[in-house]
Amino acid sequence: MALPLFQYGSAEAGKFFTIEKESEAAKLFGLDRVGPIRFALQGGAKEVLAYTVSSDVEAESFEEIREAFESRSFNVFVFPEEISAEERANTKAWVVRNRQEGKHFLAVFGGSNADDQDPAIGNERTTQLADDYIVNLITGAHVNGSPYSSGKYAPYIAGLIAGTGINKSITYAPVQATDVGKRLKNSEIAAALQKGSLLLVHDGEKVKVEQGLVTSKKKIRAIRARQAISTDIPRTAAEAYIGKLDNSADGQAALISAVKAYLERLELNHVLTDIVVTLDPERKSEGDSVYLLIGFTETDSMERIFLTVRV
């Protein structure tokens, strides 16, 4: 997962660092500056791709961040804290543009402590950020007696998403927190879910994710499966087939077979089912271009159980 740093001690500015342990981050940036990285690793991220932002001018710094991460690979992006509405909009546009250009990742956002006290404000932020590739956390958390806004706790959620397999859901996943910033009523929880917000709840024993949703109201699990497929198939084709096979019936059949084999491996891991891979009948495959029609159904997780009790 990817994370820009605005505070990083004596570390070199304008540089990428790959962090796998909190101790590495503390040595590089100072113990009092590793909070966002600590949250990401505690959430489950195997490693954090951190970038030390060199500009101290807001507009320039965010442009620098987008430009720097443009050439790097990652599956989830998050800021270390809440950002302005303008930069949220700019980042959303960046996520959308990257998707259109073939680079697929989720972005996680949050808000301020003040915003977290009114779920309607968080839900409005969700509406503004509505997209298949964006997650908006609207509740903060208390950790070891200290309160954190949803913006500052967002790196934990980003780490949780990044570290969860694409065949698993983060719904009801417990998080490392002692309480939520504000406990919402059932009606507020229902309203937030209908908007596509991601929220934390305290169930009386622990703090957990209520439901793993992106801001378009779809499930994170399904979107991450699509992202993996959209990333892996072009990469596999480029590495093993492009420039190595003739664009003939035999070459096309070999490519189709390879794509099917990849999807079937995902099917065995309960990621998807109902696989279809054929040549696209609406676009002619000729010259150096092959157009495939790929269809599948994401495997859903059991997230809600309805019981009827007769007495």
Locations of regions flagged by a protein language model:
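Surface-exposed assembly/interface segments
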Residues: M1-V311
